[in-house]
Amino acid sequence: MGHKKPTETTRSYLENAPLPNHGKTYTVVTHKEVIDNTLTLLKKSGFTVQREIYRANTNATIAQGIYHIYPSRSVDEDIINETELGMMFAWTNSYNKLVRFQCAIGAYVKVCYNGMVAGDMMNFKRKHTGTANLDCSINIADQVKNAEKYYKRIIKDRDAMKTINLTEREQAELVGRMFVQEELIDSQQTSIIKAELAKPSFHYGTDAESCWTFYNHVTHALKKAHPRYWLQDSQNFHDFIVAECLNTSKPTIKTETILSEKVVVISEPVEKVIEVDEDITDTQLIENVFLDQ
């Protein structure tokens, strides 16, 4: 936030951007290496790349690649029959030390190209030191290997959002919290969300008070985010909505106490529940311990 807004660019522009010279301890992970490794691994893993989107700041010191992909070899009926969401792979890379390499499998809404990234999917961020080149390639492969599992989790979250209604006031309160408390959106994005609430640019198949509609108003605004922030902002927003609207593991118990003919509503959260992701792989555990996260 506070940076010059990015522009879409070409693959050739990123591949030919000047390389940095930050000393012997800095390992350059070139945009070209990331692009080549991504496209090669996607093809070998049975994914068809339907669209490539590249964005960058001035001089391409921070770059981003977004790929709309289709799992050509999938035999999963839920994935084969999904028509609203497409699968997405995205990465962010830099030459100026402002952001570590990061990548994630996610989804995009076909009607508007809004992106979706869930928090536990973006499990790798690598400094440009030592064996960064190899480590980045390994992580791209790990994300691609688990693509269908991650994609189905997003589909499940989408379905849950469609069952939840948010009043106009509740939506306004969420926007205010995202701007003031969470710092997930900036003033321009807040204005975009306000405009979308009044007059949506797209129809998302749900009514104005649907959590799914609200989610898309925000992800539409997040498309204005700088490449340095877009993946992280998308992840944080998804986590925010899951915690505030979808997470039923922490229900609120409301009790009424009558005092002097007045009703006092006391809200007390129940005891916290710690959830363990049993699908964590050995690769992810090793990355968390040894790759300076």
Q: Which positions does each model-derived feature cover?
A:
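N-terminal low-complexity, intrinsically disordered segments
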Residues: M1-I62
